[in-house]
């Protein structure tokens, strides 16, 4: 139960209860689905089905940008589904990836042979492509361009492994950096952000690389169990003969050294993340960008030097995720969150870790970039008396159980919003 995992964190209990009571309406407002066309409503249904985390922040964007980003996400989700489907032979998959951007202008194109869990975005691609063609030209140009470049990059890496650290950067650029670049161009096209945001592709690329590397690091076990290899060979070959050997109990010390090396590499993007977020002016765009980034550094902090990466699933608590989502709405709070998780990593750096010096250097740079006078920062700690805390925890636990039960009873099959 989510609330039990947060019992030692009173601020998480408070935020879980607040979240259940609708306290996140400013971050995740409900949409008016009744005013949408059937095809657009279906697109938001697919968005919620394929990614609840991204769906939440996408649906909170302002104005027409919301629809553009929704369609952008679904187009790339469809492309990614083709890449991930191991049942599609290469001689069929490579041309599909290279030509996928052309399907946006083919009103009847669909693919019904996928075995992936998100195959509905391929089977009903005509609905998605219809809404793509309904977008303003400036949005269509960005989405089509990024789709084309990403498809070519995915096809390139289908036939080769991620070898060097530079190739890891290149792969992550194709599958995530381009997403950051495309989103930034959409922000500027909407005029919610300045043209500079869309022009600075280096910072936008770093935003995507930080998220993608975090996911790749966290998903080591899941990926290797199905034959996928995204950890760069240049890194893991220093510690094992085969990538999957890192999961062996007798390889734990080597596995942690490799893990820490990759976490350190991912952390080098954090200064760019700080610089990028500092430029944003629209509140909905800031929330959209900041929330995944603080989730990522929280996840990296939990992954660093953690044997569970090689034994199971490493996730942050739901209460922690809700707290981050509710707090990461301004730059001061983001600085604080980044500083706190950087400090958590610092406390876990071993004297014998091979990457120790590099880790300490990048953590020092991150602390420098996010340094603010502690006296001017909003407190993230709730100082509660023992009696009040006990009563609040009991009330929150009972209320959470009641609300979860009633919500489950009331929720119908057509509820598009999800949890």
Question: Model-derived features: where do they sit?
Answer:
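Acidic catalytic motifs of isoprenoid enzymes
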Residues: 1-274, 278, 340-345, 349, ...
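Transmembrane alpha-helical segments that form the membrane-embedded catalytic/substrate-channel core
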Residues: 212-216, 299-305
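Long amphipathic alpha-helical coiled-coil segments
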Residues: 230-231, 312-326, 346-359
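Amphipathic alpha-helical protein-interaction segments enriched in hydrophobic
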Residues: 283-297
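Interfacial loop-to-transmembrane junctions
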Residues: 315, 375-386
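Divalent metal-dependent phosphate-bond-processing catalytic cores, especially two-metal-ion Mg2+/Mn2+ enzymes
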Residues: 324-336
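Long, charge-rich low-complexity segments
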Residues: 336-378
